[in-house]
Every structure is written in structure tokens, then in C-alpha cells.
A protein has these predicted regions:
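Conserved N-lobe ATP-binding subsite of Hanks-type protein kinase domains
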Residues: 27
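Hydrophobic/aromatic scaffold residues of ePK-like serine/threonine protein kinase catalytic domains
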Residues: 68, 129-130
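Activation segment of protein kinase catalytic domains, centered on the conserved DFG
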Residues: 112-129
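Catalytic-loop of the protein kinase fold
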Residues: 141-158
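Short beta-strand micro-motifs within the conserved protein kinase catalytic domain, predominantly
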Residues: 76-93
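Conserved short submotifs of the Hanks-type protein kinase catalytic core
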Residues: 88-104
Length: 179
């Protein structure tokens, strides 16, 4: 996907009240696409973060890097926008990605630790999950990208309990990758 075609129309989405998480610069909510009724994860940059030139460049860089990625263990980038979901005259940058229903790897660890889930990864499943994450990291490095923020919170789990890397906000790439 090229960045030019990555812009989405906020009118095509309905933002829900369900907050999935909060980071330094923004919060992540579920948004429903009104055309296909699919749910997507939507990272919205906090207005108090200030939407200056530096914030614009960070969002553009994250979107540019993420939009070029295609790997089964990396969350799918769907689009970006600078327009507010609630007030079309306001700037409120956002990024939309696929939505994964089982939360993060950290959420899974907490549930297992508190014994509030019947989910258990046997050694084979752990190995397969680790293999997926390491293959995604190999893919990133092969394409000149350094994630710089890999942690359990940035590894999301899909409906089949396969891990996917997300949040490319701190990522950097080597010069010739995006040319």
C-alpha cells in the first residue's frame, strides 16, 4: 500500500467507547467500518500532545513504515487520517489497523498468572508463537526496519492465539528502504 492511498474517511467509521489501551501520545479504540461492518483498532493522538509539525512527521513516518509491511505476524495497517472522528473541523490524527480480539501478550500473561483463563500454551504452541515473532523481526530487519519498542504490550494476539507485532511509532528505517 502506498501512503497516498492510505488515507481513510472518518465518515466511513463509527468510533466506539471501547478503549483498548493508552500510550504516551494517544489512546486506542475500536472503530466500526460502516461499509463492511468490520471492527478495527484506531489509535488516536491526544490533542494535548499537540499536533505540531513534529507530531505530523512522527505519524507520517509510522504510517509510511507500517503501510509497507506485509507479514503474517505483523498487524495489518489499514489507513491514517488527520481529521477528527467527532468534529470534522478539528485536527485529530489517527491510524487504523486490523483489530485482534484477544488483547496483548501482556494481557495473556496476566490472565495466566491470575489463573482466570483456561488458555494454556503448551511448549509446542509457545515455540510456534516465538517462531512467528522472531520471523517477523527477521522480516523487519531484512527490510531495514528497527522496531525499537518490542514488548508484551506491543504483541497482540489474534482469535487463534497467533501473535502479531504492532505499534511502529518508535520505529526507524535505514535510508534506502522507502525509496
Amino acid at each position: 500500500m502506498d501512503l497516498e492511498s492510505a488515507f481513510f474517511n472518518t465518515k466511513d467509521f463509527e468510533l466506539t467507547d471501547k478503549k483498548l489501551g493508552k500510550g504516551t501520545f494517544g489512546s486506542v479504540y475500536i472503530a466500526r467500518n460502516l461499509k463492511d461492518q468490520q471492527s478495527y483498532a484506531t489509535k488516536i493522538i491526544h490533542s494535548e500532545s499537540g499536533f505540531d509539525g513534529e507530531t505530523q512527521m512522527l505519524l507520517l513516518r509510522e504510517s509510511l513504515i507500517h503501510s509497507k509491511l506485509n507479514h503474517p505476524s505483523i498487524i495489518k495497517f489499514k489507513g491514517m487520517n488527520f481529521q477528527s472522528f467527532t468534529n470534522p473541523t478539528q485536527l485529530e490524527p489517527s491510524i487504523i489497523t486490523e483489530y485482534l480480539s484477544n488483547g496483548s501478550l501482556k494481557d495473556i500473561f496476566v490472565k495466566i498468572e491470575k489463573n482466570i483463563t483456561d488458555f494454556h500454551w503448551n511448549p509446542t504452541k509457545k515455540y510456534i508463537a516465538l517462531l512467528g515473532i522472531s520471523d517477523a523481526m527477521r522480516y523487519l530487519h531484512k527490510h531495514g526496519i528497527v522496531h525499537r519498542d518490542l514488548k508484551p504490550e506491543n504483541i497482540l494476539i489474534d482469535g487463534n492465539y497467533h501473535p502479531k507485532i504492532c505499534d511502529f511509532g518508535l520505529s526507524r528505517c535505514f535510508p534506502n528502504l522507502l525509496s
